[in-house]
Amino acid sequence: MAAPFALVSRVSPAARLPIRAAWRRARPTVGLPSSGRARQLAVASAAQENRDNTAVDVHVNQDGGNQQGNAVQRRPRRSSALDGISPFGLVDPMSPMRTMRQMLDTMDRIFDDVALGFPATPRRSLATGEVRMPWDVMEDDKEVRMRFDMPGLSREEVKVMVEDDALVIRGEHKKEEGEGAEGSGDGWWKERSVSSYDMRLALPDECDKSKVRAELKNGVLLVTVPKTEVERKVIDVQVQ
């Protein structure tokens, strides 16, 4: 079968343009699927519920629900600060305090990645304009001081304990808003949200775990862990 352009060359120049245009219109159009096209998922729920779980070794989960009949779009996964992070590279068996600092520094990197969209984002100070991270650890010769931002939680909703060699901080805040009463018709709606915190930090051996102090003030939890004097046994080794 002859090519289309070979047939066009045998006719007059005035007739070539309509024939060529008709051949172009007759060519089939092939559409490649778009990799960035979002898929729609049907979600059916009667109320909205948001749950935020924050941990120091940082597991932040958020489950969102919409009203019945709505559709949500699922976005493609983006690269983030979590890529390439190995938990084995954060542990220093020779220095527990260095391990704690490395974990918190890693969390600072994660919260700097705005693509993650975590609910608990760093706060910006109005006075200095600097970013305030939601936790901090300071250490001197006498004690270890830790700060955790827990906005919206009261003292009754926060529990601090020591399990074996780990400091555990847990909190849960429930909130419910809505209008009308259940069964009153389509106009009834109610919104429930639950925020929970589960933080766990390994304490150094030289800390006095029986004298841990905790204070919650204006949404900021301050934890103080005193240190004990550790007598180091030194043995001189003769060099031959």
UniProtKB/Swiss-Prot annotation:
Domain of life of the organism encoding this protein: Eukaryota
Cellular compartment(s): Plastid, Chloroplast
GO cellular component, one term: chloroplast
Region (Disordered): 59-84
Keywords: Chloroplast, Plastid, Stress response, Transit peptide
Tissue: Expressed in roots, stems, leaves, spikelets and embryos.
The sHSP domain, residue ranges: 126-240
Keyword Nucleotidyltransferase: no
GO biological process, one term: response to heat
Transit peptide per record: 1-43
A matching Pfam family: HSP20
Induction: By heat shock.
CDD domains, per the entry: ACD_sHsps-like
Sequence similarity: Belongs to the small heat shock protein (HSP20) family.
Subunit structure, as described in the record: May form oligomeric structures.
Protein name from the UniProt record: 26.7 kDa heat shock protein, chloroplastic
Encoding gene (name): HSP26.7
